């Protein structure tokens, strides 16, 4: 395999894992692009992005432009490096055409969906929310559009019924390096393929989307909860408080035709609520300013029986 000079652009954990794996290959990482450092927490302590941490540990130069309009000098610095390829995954900063034109073999984007399905910001969450049974990693030749470039390689992944956005994210973090290295190996001869099919869009997640609609089926609610785990978290409103849900299971049919959203019963093992077709049991709940707890632990300090028969929403 030919040794390539690569510039890597990414910011969060998933990007950091791919970068770690890329360092293990024979390719040369010339520089890393990541978002600017952020002040976080009560003490406003400056934190580096996960990608920056990995780059510094490997003694690689790091560029952190606020934007390429505000920091045009970064483009010039990248041009001087004359990279063969720029690899991008979850960078989070818009790149201009001038950036895309720099590398010899173009810019490769690692996108975690089977394009053209779920273009955009939240492909993992939207795939689970929609009840998809499969997803994948696409290595895409970047162009000026939103995830519209030609496909160079694909790795398909099954979505299990127990997968959350966190577990699927972790799978992508481990598996994305395989199709990337395959693509880099054949970069001189690989034939880009235009995306086929009707595109769908994975719009950015909002905090308010976590609210559970119990008029939906138990399966739809399961998809909703798993899609929004860990963030923003799925929840229902009880006594004007947002109660986040944790572990759950789908039980028997709603044979008594209880109205969707009715709290059927509360046991030490769970909190049972009717959906449009079945009963769903929540084994864990999180009340405001509290930790996520098993129902048995909540019952030790809180009277929940008074809510039996109460209809949510």
UniProtKB/Swiss-Prot annotation:
GO terms for molecular function: methionyl-tRNA formyltransferase activity. It is an enzyme of class 2 (transferase). It comes from the Bacteria. (6S)-5,6,7,8-tetrahydrofolate binds at residues 113-116. CDD domains: FMT_core_Met-tRNA-FMT_N, Met_tRNA_FMT_C. Its EC number is 2.1.2.9. Keywords: Protein biosynthesis, Transferase. Gene3D superfamilies: 3.40.50.12230. One of its GO terms (cellular component) is cytosol. It catalyses: L-methionyl-tRNA(fMet) + (6R)-10-formyltetrahydrofolate = N-formyl-L-methionyl-tRNA(fMet) + (6S)-5,6,7,8-tetrahydrofolate + H(+). PANTHER family: METHIONYL-TRNA FORMYLTRANSFERASE, METHIONYL-TRNA FORMYLTRANSFERASE, MITOCHONDRIAL. Belongs to the Fmt family. HAMAP family: Formyl_trans. Attaches a formyl group to the free amino group of methionyl-tRNA(fMet). The formyl group appears to play a dual role in the initiator identity of N-formylmethionyl-tRNA by promoting its recognition by IF2 and preventing the misappropriation of this tRNA by the elongation apparatus. This is Methionyl-tRNA formyltransferase. It comes from Francisella tularensis subsp. tularensis (strain SCHU S4 / Schu 4). The lineage of its organism: Bacteria, Pseudomonadati, Pseudomonadota, Gammaproteobacteria, Thiotrichales.
